[in-house]
Amino acid sequence: MRFDAADAHWRETPRPGASGAQKDWLTRGGSLTAHLARLGRVTVRVTREAVATPWADERGALACAPRAPVWVREVVLAVDGTPFVAAHSIAPLAASKGVWQAMRRLRTRPLAELLYSDPEVTRSALVSRRVIAGHPLFALASHALSPGHATPHAFAARRSVFERRGTPLMVTECMLPALWRHLDAHGERRARDFEGA
């Protein structure tokens, strides 16, 4: 079976109003953690690991029933201490004890270590959308913001489905305003390149 994260809201082409940096980062393949590492020191803070039910827009992508249990891992990826990305990953509960059991043992290591080191893992196309209040991802991203920063009207997010031995693991990544501010100010240069300047 081919798993696909696209639907009426999640599309392969970023929305027309997206900035150049947003279009680039929403469609950029490879490891997001590795791309962030070009900007500075990346740390992973795990905010949730639990059994849950999939969000409404996740069920179709994973071909699972509405109340089917899934294993959820949520993290915040920070660069030099500033939160840049809130990520939400899910796999069928049985798979989290089988094919994808390694995701339960990552702790503060990035999921990329698991996904990009295994030749058996394939990835669907990246899809993206604008996330506004009412979507559970909006709440997740809002909680990940640095203290004192106002919540934006919307967030840019992307997702894709990784497959191993016919079993899916979906990763959704929500870009936080600090990422766009950094790119606007410095481009892709590492933050420490500016220290002592």
From Swiss-Prot:
This is Probable chorismate pyruvate-lyase. It catalyses: chorismate = 4-hydroxybenzoate + pyruvate. Belongs to the UbiC family. PANTHER family: CHORISMATE PYRUVATE-LYASE. GO terms for molecular function: chorismate lyase activity. GO terms for biological process: pyruvate biosynthetic process; ubiquinone biosynthetic process. Pfam families: Chor_lyase (PF04345). One of its GO terms (cellular component) is cytosol. Residues 1-14 have a biased composition (Basic and acidic residues). Gene3D superfamilies: Chorismate lyase-like (3.40.1410.10). Substrate binds at residues 73, 111, 173. Its EC number is 4.1.3.40. It is found in: Cytoplasm. It comes from Burkholderia thailandensis (strain ATCC 700388 / DSM 13276 / CCUG 48851 / CIP 106301 / E264). Removes the pyruvyl group from chorismate, with concomitant aromatization of the ring, to provide 4-hydroxybenzoate (4HB) for the ubiquinone pathway. Residues 1-25 are annotated as: Disordered. Pathway: Cofactor biosynthesis; ubiquinone biosynthesis. Keywords: Cytoplasm, Lyase, Pyruvate, Ubiquinone biosynthesis.
